Amino acid sequence: GAGVDIGTGVVTTVGRDYEDKTYIYHPTTGKIIPGIQLPCWEEALLTVKEAHEFMPESAVLGWDIAFTEKGPVIIEVNGAPGPKIHQFADKEPKGKPIFDYIKVKSNRTYNPKQNTL
């Protein structure tokens, strides 16, 4: 995985695998990973936001998106996404700011049995 600036869609870190090996160059394309602009980023965000409206009971969902020549395509949605990969890529914890934001936006109480807010 690699860190992505959610506001711009620009990759902000080197790639990193689960063995903590880092990649400056993409292993398939050979392109330098940091600085890559993900294509049709705004369209991808809109696609995810619209799809999430069909699942309002889930405050947090993990979206796997493919960037194709025809635009972004949802591969799958995860009801209980693991934050490990995002923290692993950036080498910093993400939990507190995200959960503070979710609590404010959702105005709901966390239910550990359902893993939802």
Regions found by a protein language model. Give the residues of each.
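Phosphate-binding site of ATP-dependent enzymes
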Residues: 1-17
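Acidic, metal/cofactor-coordinating or nucleic-acid-engaging core segments within structured domains
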Residues: 21
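C-terminal active-site "lid" helix and adjoining low-complexity regulatory extension at the edge
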Residues: 24-46, 53-58, 67-117
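Short, surface-exposed charged micro-motifs
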Residues: 62-64
